[in-house]
């Protein structure tokens, strides 16, 4: 109807949105272009549930910190290269900005060097989370405190399923630091998927 304002609640979150701090009223920063699938999907999901999405035209480490402080960013998504560039800023610059509004700073897309992740946890604390996932579905999640006791891990299946690492013959790999193919098994309860 004309000249009527319809008030609607945001659509409910999809999938594991709650795992990554997605909620109505959140302020989400994807600190680079939206063409990678994960950043676009996270941005769309955040917008869909009523969050504010603040998009940077290109990544600039100090500008990202300025935006976090100015916009009171609560959730964000990073790659290890972003972390390296943030950490390469002079300490005085890093301390200039208040990033205490961050509740979730999730990272993925490439292995994060242990020293880099350790430094980010020391700086941003429990906000740091990492996920590992495949385009086909399934994934793992690890939060800062668990990672500190399992450095180098990408966590456990995010919805209670199982993760298998298999060698080229399809046999399970039990020892650490061996390459293999990663397989996800969905949890038995469809509500957990």
Regions found by a protein language model. Give the residues of each.
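AMP-binding/adenylate-forming core of the ANL superfamily
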Residues: 175-191
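Conserved AMP-binding/adenylation subdomain of ANL enzymes
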Residues: 2-75, 89
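Solvent-exposed alpha-helices and their adjacent loops that cap or buttress functional pockets
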Residues: 19-23, 97-98, 155-157, 174-176
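Residues that mark the start of a beta-strand
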Residues: 26-27, 103, 181
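Adenylate-forming
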Residues: 2-18, 28, 65-67, 83-90, ...
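Short beta->alpha linker loops
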Residues: 59-60, 81, 111
